Amino acid sequence: MTADAHLFSASDLEAATRIAEPDFELLDALIRTDDPDDQAHTLARVALSAFDNYYAVSRRIPALAKAAFYARDWPATVRLSKIRIGLYTACIDQLVPLLKAGLPELANDEQVWVRAEAELLAAIAGRYEADFAFAFWQSLRRKLVSDEWRPVSYDTGPAARPPAAIAAVVRTIAATLPIQPEVIRNVLDAAGFTGPWRDLDGDAALAAAAIEAALEPLSPRAGETAKIEIAESGFFRNRGACLVGRIRLRDRGDMPPRNIPLLVALLNEDDGLVVDAVLCDSDELQFAFSSTLANYHATNPRYHELARLLHELMPKRPLGTQYSCIGFHHLGKVAVMNEILTEHRRSKEKLATAPGFKGTVAIAFTMPCSAYVLKIIRDHPTDDYKFDYFDGLDAVLRKYNLVHEIDRAGSMLDNIIYSNVKLARTMFAPDLLDELLEAGIGTVTLERDALVFRHLIVQIKLTPLPLYLTTAAAADARAAVINLGDCIKNNAAADIFNKDLDGRNYGVSRIRKVYLFDYDAVEQLTEVKVRSTPPMPRAEDEDGVVFRPAQMLEGLRIDDPGLRRAFRDAHPELMQPDYWEGMQHALRAGKVPKVMNYPTSRRLRR
């Protein structure tokens, strides 16, 4: 294919991803019966039918994403990501009004819910996706009883599964060192990539050489045997695709067993498929699979085994976020909350105010041992708030949801928003408890021995950038400020502009990448007015968000002159209106930007 194609029209995609209507016969039977046992049985069937409708469409989307990748239909890849991320909620929202209208008393009938849950658990017993169906059931119930602010459990409960065995999703390929190009062909075949290729022989030779270089620190020997474990799945996202696995070297007597992770990144160019990069470093894989990017569509349906494999390849990244990065957000929500509760139970640590700077809009809190930061939005901003008008809690939550639903371009943290979640009062340090109840009256209530959160935001823990710059080695600090510029550019490519360009809104991860993590001040870049400096007469009276690029360095809180110079030298265009206006024009034209999610040094042809 020699040019970008449009395999799917908007109507084609809508038809292919449309959720079937609820089973109206079952709904009618549910509404008509007065027998509590019949009600419970039928309610379970109604919910399971809705879940099955949802699950069928969600499993269809990865194949559509693969087809769009092969057709080079980039707008379709973007639409599929948006469709998939909203599908779960759309399915719940399709059913809830019908149940509320037909059975308004259902929300208060605890006995029917208890019996119906037992019926549902019996119906899903033995199904692979039983835990997902149970999570769907909990979401449905929460939506129906939300007016009562009833807290729910995020435990997987009776639908829990035994630990996943990754052998179910990998193919093992035997090899003899040094790795030969023919082995790379087998690796690509195992993950389901078939071409047409631009230069498969050349790519295979370059990929084999890259793997050999990555193996060198493991002291390999010619003739030594290796096992390559490859996930039998393609992973598709926007303009790219990849396969993942690992290379194992066995105990050699003088050397213990050794292994390295493996990611092979593919592009589909005008003249065919290209192996673009090979990654064999866990931190680099973690960035490629980061929740700061759009989710991957994985063609293998065994999500537990895939998440477990990804966790083994990227152990610094919690298991819960591995589910989210392959599109299973609601299972990720369950796993993340369980991880937080387990961290507390094992460490006995209290949740306390997060290190760094006091938020003017959010209250952030964590445990020293935790991989996560929890947040609520204040009822009113603090006196240090920079802007004249505060849109309020619901508007801020909409911005956090906006970031969740877009391609975060590798530079914005994803966030999980829980509703009506209950946490034991004993989990909280006294000072934090007082602040939450005083500044979050619209969000937090105390019920006996627990706090109930109307909304609770959870993100991966970062080190605030200004704090990081005071403690990092000189080279790491310089790399961070340069990466900050990359972060701002990637945000712009995703049509996101942070009008509060303050370094305190950015953080550094465990793998030393910089991300935006506070979203109360984000706007769509296409709606921002980019202006030169000095302002024109009466320009300060302009409505909307006005941005003067020449002034951006002043707000970033990069105090060290050498670091400011490093930022300016690496990203001079960020201080020029032309750059921002050019990005706005591209976004308005509907262009899908290329976002690099691995180091340029890992590309096979640079």
UniProtKB/Swiss-Prot annotation:
InterPro entries: AceK_kinase (IPR046855), AceK_regulatory (IPR046854), Isocitrate_DH_AceK (IPR010452). One of its GO terms (molecular function) is ATP binding. It catalyses: L-seryl-[isocitrate dehydrogenase] + ATP = O-phospho-L-seryl-[isocitrate dehydrogenase] + ADP + H(+). ATP binds at residues 354-360, 375. One of its GO terms (biological process) is glyoxylate cycle. Coiled coil: none annotated. Keywords: ATP-binding, Cytoplasm, Glyoxylate bypass, Hydrolase, Kinase, Nucleotide-binding, Protein phosphatase, Serine/threonine-protein kinase, Transferase, Tricarboxylic acid cycle. The lineage of its organism: Bacteria, Pseudomonadati, Pseudomonadota, Alphaproteobacteria, Hyphomicrobiales. One of its GO terms (cellular component) is cytoplasm. This is Isocitrate dehydrogenase kinase/phosphatase.
